[in-house]
């Protein structure tokens, strides 16, 4: 029942421990920090990739199919491999943000590319007739035209980064985060279902706030 879920927030998460809401705040902040870093990495990478594709049809034909194919592989299958690679590279602290970035870069790439390449033909021909450089066309025509698409992509990617961070926490071995909290409470679901649902609702709230 909803009342049981709400009551569980003020009950101790563990015996003689702090209230559940306090534990979830700590876990939520850890997840949010990973999501923010992943959002930044994925956003910058996706934006740069879209600019490259917008200026090179060869790169678009050669790489875009692989970008699309990368999103057909379940993130749950890729996350453990990323954790292993980052651990071997001595950057295990960045494993979760990288997993979050993996889900973030794709919407940014696709939406930004669509905005950059959907400029009015007459406007593009006019700038070319004035011998405008590629850089001038990019900053004065393509980017302003793509802004609505970019903002849409960022809103989608914001929630995707939270999902990626939560999933990335599961195989990473970290001690704090919403993913770990959900996993730990799920082990005792039969004993205390409200705690699991309270944690899931808190994770959803983080995604809504980041959106």
List where the protein language model places each region.
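Short hydrophobic, aromatic-rich alpha-helical segments embedded in or entering the lipid bilayer
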Residues: 1-11, 172-187
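Alpha-helical membrane-interface segments at transmembrane helix boundaries
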Residues: 25-36, 60, 67-70, 147, ...
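Transmembrane-helix boundary motif in ABC transporter permease subunits
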Residues: 37-67
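Generic hydrophobic transmembrane alpha-helix motif, especially the helices
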Residues: 68-107, 114-115
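Short cytoplasmic-facing helical segments at TM-TM junctions of multi-pass membrane proteins
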Residues: 111-150
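Hydrophobic alpha-helical transmembrane segments of polytopic membrane proteins
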Residues: 178-211
């Amino acid at each position: 029942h909803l009342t049981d879920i709400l009551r569980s927030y003020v009950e101790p998460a563990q015996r003689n421990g702090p209230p559940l809401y306090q534990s979830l705040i700590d876990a939520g902040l850890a997840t949010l920090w990973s999501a923010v870093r992943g959002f930044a990495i994925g956003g910058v990478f996706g934006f740069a990739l879209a600019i490259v594709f917008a200026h090179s049809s060869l790169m678009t034909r050669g790489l875009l199919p692989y970008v699309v194919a990368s999103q057909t592989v379940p993130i749950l299958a890729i996350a453990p491999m990323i954790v292993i690679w980052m651990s071997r590279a001595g950057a295990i602290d960045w494993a979760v943000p990288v997993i979050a970035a993996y889900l973030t870069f794709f919407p940014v790439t696709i939406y930004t590319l669509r905005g950059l390449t959907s400029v009015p033909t007459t406007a593009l021909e006019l700038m070319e007739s004035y011998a405008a450089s590629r850089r001038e066309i990019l900053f004065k025509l393509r980017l302003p035209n793509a802004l609505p698409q970019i903002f849409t992509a960022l809103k989608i990617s914001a929630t995707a980064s939270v999902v990626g961070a939560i999933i990335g926490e599961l195989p990473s071995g970290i001690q704090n985060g919403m993913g770990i909290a959900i996993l730990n409470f799920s082990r005792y679901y039969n004993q205390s279902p409200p705690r699991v649902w309270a944690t899931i609702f808190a994770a959803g709230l983080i995604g809504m706030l980041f959106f």
